[in-house]
């Protein structure tokens, strides 16, 4: 289970596993294992063991020695490959001693200096003296520290009960980890990343090896399970970081060397070979240091090829008439690359090499040279033979038979056979060990200039064993010729040897005691629709790609274990869409798994693009399988692919199943999961534990066997239920199960349309929340306020949750500041769960296993973009002084504002982390003081606005109870007061308009009074809809009359002289009324508003566009003016009419108000 804690400063992650040895498993049990558990409560049960499952930090390392950088790297890689074949813990001390002796052979930094010089020469760039000395000094310190740690580890392993040994090794481990953290940046100096790359790769390799030790020994050192998980997460995080760094700068260095001529190609070619051996081969092993994923060891397969230099006369300088090939002007970079480097292909083995010889005369002399060759090769475990021919094939031939183990060394002689007029480059001798000899004749015997090649110079043997590290797999060839005056001037026939590592298993052997790696590039034959790609450097070889349904490839395997042995399957893949993989054994399906996308279309393949997924084995569709014969055929198919997607497979893994051991591992895992929830006293939950972790621990316990571990299961269930109760008690959110939405209670969840609650499902043990996409300008949201009364001043709080999938989900925590988090979580938690026969229809054991694997594959997020994609999240917010004058609760807001956004999430909780202290407290106090000062400034400003608005509203009424409107005021005065009220800021939260801001209460107070004034104004006005807010309702109109809007203001517009608008009124006869009109005339002519009664009495207010003074104030034709007239109606029916003579007439409001005498 991973957990990603995200705030402004940090993002944290964590997974887990456990693995007892076979020696510890005993079935059947000699005595009842449950007897001691009777009458015991869960706290006693959890205290029963000496192990402590609460929290940890860790680090391991590696060393190398040899006469030069390449040999040292080959020696290190070879030893690591051997160590990875068995569990690490049994050989760790000798393994570290070997690495120390290899990398610091005489306790100095000569090897590291060799690494630096190697790349400096390849790229022709010197490391600055300061950077070199600084790096070497730090490397010397790392070597010394690692040596101390190795000895401390050796002493502790010799006597694990010695408390001094324990405290020393634990302290040395922590110190060495920090040494690496501080040292690694010195090997990545800006501008010198490429020449320092070999040093960087070897150093980070040691760091990752060190970090692995936390998982191996952390419990014995007294680390809590949480601490161990933290170290494990750092190992995963740094594996991705270090891998991507090495891959990026390898490619950068290679691209910088790309040129146009022979010399540039040679430098490019050498850099590619040596950096593959020194950097990429090491990087490809990083994932196998994960002892949770590979507890019993594995056999990594480095299937990549390397090429030694072309066999051609190319000494450092010309010799007499002879010319070194590197300076020739007639071969281009691209033709050499195309001729010498094979296109991506399936892994194959060389069966035989038949070399043709041809005689080239120069005057009376001649040379028999290697003119071409025919290769016979086979794909692994395939009887079909592939044949390739290069160059000129003649009848004079020599056949090389590499034998079962293959050729591992070749000594060759390249000749420049030249006169003053003509020259030819050729190879006249090559000795293959083992394999045979090609030997051509020259006349005279010592004719021509010679250059001797020994492949051991470029691929030296492992220094510790003297054994060769590579075998010959292919030979490419390049022929060229230039003419002058119709005759040959220069010609050449140049072979290049291609090599693969000798430890690649040519039989695809399946063993019962370790996880077998089957790279799909080791398939037995090409398949239509499947493309072989040169994999990224970190895959260690080629990968296969498909874009349609069909067969990826067929692997022929050799089973070296009893046919009763059970296995399960894993796959390492990358994809831009969802698809399924099905594996068949001899045509019978033995496993299928649905996989989600791991990358976006068009993205480059990075380390994070690849995920390892297990084919679940607990369900009826993917039971553990067995092999039926010693030679089997495994077919890997792609199914259910999406159109336009790209689907990549790196490898299939065959994992031995030990039911007895795995059952005990399940119990141990459940114990760890449950125990790690609690504090050491078992009375409370650990601060970093989330509600989601509690639910997943409950699932682990539920999956334990009732028959084997009935009482253990009972105790663990009691404990995990207690943990769930503690989780609910500490959760400050009301109704975390979403039982009631939009209740009438003050607090609790408030939500918009588009929010639904789902019950359970394969990814949540409880209820889940679903937010649909927004509707144009209407977001989908749900929020809740945590009241200040339950908060503490200067305290950190954390919001946790689990997102199944989301797009544009915004998560906000609001106090006196806002913490904003956006989650774009891919829908990659593919559920292959099946019904277990229960009412829920969900097999929690199967679901738990799948989801945990996918979450473990998320790694630690490297940046905010990756953090946005993790399923688990945590967001932090700190409280200040909880100023009593402001309602300072914490608002929790979830919303989707985009029309294609969505979210499904659950396990929400807001918990107290603890009081702030030190720098965090000081920073919060400073921020809080600034906030209070700013609040005071804003309040002073708002107080001025509030006082002005309140005075304006007071003027609207004649009484203190706001029951009677001032007869002298009209709509203009109400609008003026409204504008003042609307100028109040901080009424609503910037995050969501439904959340009140700090000035919400005063705004509401004034708004309520304004509404009362508007109501009284509307009630007293005999003219219906006199402010035209309801358009032309209640008005009789002709054409060319309309209502327009400008902001909150509505006004009647007459745009033609024949337009008329009128309304009939009912009034009290013989009472005093005032007709008040606010209007504006534009253009020529006049505008008229006339009032008349049934007795033919009338009054008219006239408006025109001429300039004039109103009470001594100049008014232009863009201003609205108000005119009024007193009228005494003699009938109860009245008419108001609006017209104009020409131009346009704009009327803001018409009032006919009864007044007192």
Swiss-Prot record:
Family according to the record: Belongs to the delta endotoxin family.
Function description: Promotes colloidosmotic lysis by binding to the midgut epithelial cells of Lepidoptera larvae. Has a fairly broad spectrum of activity against members of the Pyralidae, Plutellidae, Sphingidae and Noctuidae families. It was the first insecticidal crystal protein characterized with activity against cutworms. No activity is observed against some beetles, such as the Colorado potato beetle.
Descriptive protein name: Pesticidal crystal protein Cry9Ca
Misc note: Toxic segment of the protein is located in the N-terminus.
Gene Ontology terms for molecular function: signaling receptor binding; toxin activity
Keyword Ligase: no
Lineage: Bacteria, Bacillati, Bacillota, Bacilli, Bacillales
Organism expressing this protein natively: Bacillus thuringiensis subsp. tolworthi
Coiled coil: none
Keyword Hydrolase recorded: no
Annotated InterPro entries: Cry1Ac-like_dom-VII, Cry_V, Galactose-bd-like_sf, Pest_crys, Pest_crys_dom-III, Pest_crys_dom_I, Pest_crys_N_sf, Pest_cryst_cen_dom_sf
Alphabetical list of Pfam families matching this protein: Cry1Ac_D5, Cry1Ac_dom-VII, Endotoxin_C, Endotoxin_M, Endotoxin_N
Swiss-Prot/TrEMBL GO biological process terms: sporulation resulting in formation of a cellular spore; symbiont-mediated killing of host cell
UniProt keyword annotations, A-Z: Sporulation, Toxin, Virulence
Top-level taxon of the source organism: Bacteria
């Amino acid at each position: 289970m991973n957990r990603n804690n995200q705030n402004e400063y940090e993002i944290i992650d964590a997974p887990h596993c456990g693995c007892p040895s076979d020696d510890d498993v005993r079935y059947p049990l000699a005595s009842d294992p449950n007897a001691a558990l009777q009458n015991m409560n869960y706290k006693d049960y959890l205290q029963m063991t000496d192990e402590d499952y609460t929290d940890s930090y860790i680090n391991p390392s590696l060393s190398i020695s040899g006469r030069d950088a390449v040999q040292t790297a080959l020696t290190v890689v070879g030893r690591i490959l051997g160590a990875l074949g068995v569990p690490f813990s049994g050989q760790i001390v000798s393994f570290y001693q070997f690495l120390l002796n290899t990398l610091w052979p005489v306790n100095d930094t000569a090897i590291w200096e060799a690494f630096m010089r190697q790349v400096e020469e390849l790229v022709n760039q010197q490391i600055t003296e300061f950077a070199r000395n600084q790096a070497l000094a730090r490397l010397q310190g790392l070597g010394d520290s690692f040596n101390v740690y190795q000895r401390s580890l050796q002493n502790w392993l010799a006597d694990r009960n010695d408390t001094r040994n324990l405290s020393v090794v634990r302290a040395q481990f922590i110190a060495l980890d920090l040494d690496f953290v501080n040292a690694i940046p010195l090997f990545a100096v800006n501008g010198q990343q490429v020449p320092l790359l070999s040093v960087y790769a070897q150093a980070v390799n040691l760091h990752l090896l060190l970090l692995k030790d936390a998982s191996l020994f952390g419990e014995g050192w007294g680390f809590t399970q949480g601490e161990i998980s933290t170290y494990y997460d750092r190992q995963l995080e740094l594996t991705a970081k270090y891998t991507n760094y090495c891959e990026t700068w390898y490619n950068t260095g290679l691209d910088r060397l790309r040129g146009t001529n022979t010399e540039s190609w040679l430098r490019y070619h050498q850099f590619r070979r040596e950096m593959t051996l020194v950097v990429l081969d090491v990087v490809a092993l990083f994932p196998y240091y994960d002892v949770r994923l590979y507890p019993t060891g594995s056999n990594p397969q480095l299937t990549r090829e390397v090429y030694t230099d072309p066999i051609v006369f190319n000494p450092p300088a010309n010799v007499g008439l002879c010319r070194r090939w590197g300076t020739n002007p007639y071969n281009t970079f691209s033709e050499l690359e195309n001729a010498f480097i094979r296109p991506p292909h399936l892994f194959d083995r060389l069966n035989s090499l038949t070399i043709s010889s041809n005689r080239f005369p120069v005057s009376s002399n001649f040379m028999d040279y290697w003119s071409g060759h025919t290769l016979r090769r086979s794909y692994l475990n395939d009887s079909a033979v592939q044949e390739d021919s290069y160059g000129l094939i003649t009848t004079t031939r020599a056949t090389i038979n590499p034998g079962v183990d293959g050729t591992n060394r070749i000594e060759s002689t390249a000749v420049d056979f030249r006169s003053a007029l003509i020259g030819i480059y050729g190879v006249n001798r090559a000795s293959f060990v083992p394999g045979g000899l090609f030997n051509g004749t020259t006349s005279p015997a010592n004719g021509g200039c010679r250059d001797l090649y020994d492949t051991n110079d470029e691929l030296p043997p492992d220094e510790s064993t003297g054994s060769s590290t590579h075998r010959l797999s292919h030979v490419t060839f390049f022929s060229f010729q230039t003419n002058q005056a119709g005759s040959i001037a220069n010609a050449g026939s140049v072979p290049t040897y291609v090599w693969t590592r000798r430890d690649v298993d040519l039989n695809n052997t399946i063993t019962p005691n370790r996880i077998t790696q089957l790279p799909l590039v080791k398939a037995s034959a090409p398949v239509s629709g499947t493309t072989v790609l040169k994999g990224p450097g970190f895959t260690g070889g080629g990968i296969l790609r498909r874009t349609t349904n069909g067969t990826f490839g067929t692997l022929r395997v050799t089973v070296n274990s009893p046919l009763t042995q059970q296995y399960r399957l894993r796959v390492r893949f990358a994809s831009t869409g969802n698809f399924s993989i099905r594996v068949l054994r001899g045509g019978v399906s033995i496993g299928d798994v649905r996989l989600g996308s791991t990358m976006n279309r068009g993205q480059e393949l990075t380390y994070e693009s690849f995920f390892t997924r297990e084919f679940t084995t607990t369900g009826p569709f993917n039971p553990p399988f067995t092999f039926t014969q010693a030679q089997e055929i495994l077919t890997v198919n792609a199914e259910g692919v999406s159109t336009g997607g790209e689907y990549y497979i790196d490898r299939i893994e065959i994992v031995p199943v030990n039911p007895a051991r795995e059952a005990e591992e399940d119990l141990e895992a459940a114990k760890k999961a449950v125990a790690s929830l609690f504090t050491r006293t078992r009375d409370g939950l650990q601060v970093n534990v989330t509600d989601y972790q509690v639910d997943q621990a409950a699932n682990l316990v539920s999956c334990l066997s009732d028959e084997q571990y009935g009482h253990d299961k009972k105790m663990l269930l009691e404990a995990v239920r207690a943990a769930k109760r503690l989780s609910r008690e500490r959760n400050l959110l009301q109704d975390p199960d979403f039982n009631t939405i939009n209740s009438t209670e003050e607090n609790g969840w408030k939500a918009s349309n588009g929010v639904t609650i789902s019950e359970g499902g394969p990814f949540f043990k409880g209820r889940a929340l679903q937010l649909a996409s927004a509707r144009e300008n209407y977001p989908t949201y749900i929020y809740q306020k945590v009241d200040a009364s339950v908060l503490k001043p200067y305290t950190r709080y954390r919001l946790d949750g689990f997102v199944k999938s989301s797009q544009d989900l915004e998560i906000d925590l609001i106090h006196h500041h806002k913490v904003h988090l956006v989650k774009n979580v891919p829908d990659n938690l593919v559920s292959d769960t099946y019904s277990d026969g229960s009412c829920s229809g969900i097999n929690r054991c199967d679901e738990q296993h799948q989801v945990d694997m996918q979450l473990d594959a998320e790694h630690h997020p490297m940046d905010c973009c990756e953090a946005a994609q993790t399923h688990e999240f945590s967001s932090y917010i700190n409280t200040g002084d909880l100023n009593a004058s402001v309602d300072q609760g914490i608002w929790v807001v979830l919303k989707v504002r985009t029309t294609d956004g969505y979210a499904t999430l659950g396990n929400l909780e807001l918990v107290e982390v603890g009081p702030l202290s030190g720098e965090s407290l000081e920073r919060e106090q400073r921020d809080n003081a600034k906030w209070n000062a700013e609040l005071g400034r804003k309040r002073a400003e708002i107080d001025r606005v509030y006082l002005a608005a309140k005075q304006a509203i007071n003027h609207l009424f004649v009484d203190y109870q706001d029951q009677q409107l001032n007869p002298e005021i009209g709509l203009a005065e109400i609008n003026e007061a409204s504008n003042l009220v609307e100028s109040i800021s901080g009424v609503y939260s910037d995050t969501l308009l439904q959340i009140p801001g700090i000035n919400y209460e005063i705004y509401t107070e004034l708004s309520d009074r304004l509404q009362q004034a508007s109501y009284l104004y509307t009630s007293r006005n005999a003219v219906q809809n006199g402010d035209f807010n309801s358009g032309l309702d209640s008005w009789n109109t002709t054409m060319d009359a309309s209502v327009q809007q400008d902001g909150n203001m509505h006004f009647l517009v007459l745009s033609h002289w024949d337009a008329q608008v009128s309304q009939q009124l009912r009034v009290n006869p013989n009472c005093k009324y005032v007709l008040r009109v606010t209007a504006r005339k534009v253009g020529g002519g006049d505008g008229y508003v006339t009032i008349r009664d049934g007795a033919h009495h009338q009054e008219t207010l006239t408006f025109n566009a001429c300039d004039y003074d109103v009470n001594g104030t100049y008014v232009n034709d863009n201003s609205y003016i108000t005119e009024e007239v007193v009228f005494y109606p003699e009938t109860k029916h009245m008419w108001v009419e609006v017209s104009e003579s020409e131009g346009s007439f704009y009327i803001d409001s018409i009032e006919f108000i009864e007044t007192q005498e």
